[in-house]
């Protein structure tokens, strides 16, 4: 494998490559996703009996207020919202032009007495393996909406709980790692192909772009759009 991914085994797709594909005439829309880690400032995460039982003293110290960020340019097209695992119950979805906005789980909001329109601060976590630059950034974000949804299986760490995931705009998720939207490392991207186009010929066409295709796979999805993932 020529693309080993991030230190934590996450995706490693370049923003500039996503841009090249998105500019193809047969693509009408796309979703790009960044996974990052940050700490809530002055707010607490959701814990369960399971997550507390599994916690080492070191983990409870280093990741006491740590949440997962899913940075996405259009949240209504994000996998978990499409599949129904997450459901927006209040406010509005994140859109392409949004900056410093988040969707928060209703249980996390309830625990911290937060509502749509409130602002919170998140900051880089220096113990996170994927924070390769040792970034120490603080980002203030506004809650644009609340979502619901619960893990189907058990979890060992609080960060795996849906309750402790913030859906953010791409800019905010990139910034906690000291990146911009252009320099960020993306988990994956999904491209929506115009309905009258033959998918195989579009994929063949994209293969001619100036992109190192040894690093990626274009996955053909049954719902008629290719997804870009690390190979």
Functional labels for PLM-detected ranges:
Residues 2-223:
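Basic-flanked hydrophobic alpha-helices used for secretion and membrane insertion
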Residues 1, 225-231:
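Hydrophobic alpha-helical transmembrane segments of multi-pass inner-membrane transport and secretion
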